[in-house]
Amino acid sequence: MGLKNLDIMLGIESRVVFDILDVINGVTTLNKALVKDKRLDNLFLLPACKSIDVTKINFSYLEKIIVELRKEFDFIFIDSPAGIERGFYNAIRSASEAIVVVNNDITSIRDADKVIGILNSQSILDTKLVINKVNLKKIDESTSITIDDVIDLLNIPLLGVIYEDDDVIRCNNLGIPLAIESKSYINKCYCNISKRLNGEDVRLVKGKMSIFARLFG
């Protein structure tokens, strides 16, 4: 429902034949529209429709699709559009809990605070926080908001932290999910988030500065 590019990030764009609109219009079945990841047997993507504005979709159909998916899957993630507009409201209609992803800058935090308020008003009270693109050098220089300050300002449980790293861009361009890229220490961030989401008690991954930042920072 968001930027409609998850197929690229997963490296499966060439295998997409149908999308969610095809399912809604009865062109194909839900099972045929789902694209299975070649590396992970239990990871599937239901592609968004790239040719139509997401706000024009009748989301009562999305709710029916989610009901069907819940019969087969333990976790269903709905990628919400950016901003607080109709697409966002439609996306959360089918959600029972939410993960709010925020950068540690004041603008992003303010937007996230509004989102959390809306989620609460829609009775989505199980809301967790992921802080993205954390740059430890900027925090050390006091030019970026600390992780603790973000948690205090938003006042929801922290699910995990993703540190700013070139591996994120590299893996996105290669269509490799960082969660399965074992060569990257950012992999541990994603793995720990998934474990905490599943109820496991694991510590947050500590970030690291580059050697140049440590020597000359």
Positions of PLM-derived features:
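Short, conserved glycine- and acidic-residue-centered signature motifs
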Residues: 58, 62, 108, 186
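P-loop/Walker-type NTP enzyme "switch/lid" segment
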Residues: 1-71, 172-173
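Conserved phosphate/pyrophosphate-binding and hydrolysis machinery centered on Walker-type P-loop NTPases
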Residues: 55, 59, 88, 183
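C-terminal boundary of histidine-terminating zinc-finger modules
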Residues: 172-188
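A short, charged, Gly/Pro-tolerant segment at domain boundaries
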Residues: 192-196, 205-217
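Residue-level signature of catalytic and energy-coupling elements of molecular machines
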Residues: 6, 23, 46, 79, ...
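A generic structural signal for short coil/turn motifs at secondary-structure boundaries
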Residues: 53-56, 137-140, 180
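Conserved catalytic-core segment of NTP-binding enzymes
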Residues: 64, 68-71, 75, 81-164, ...
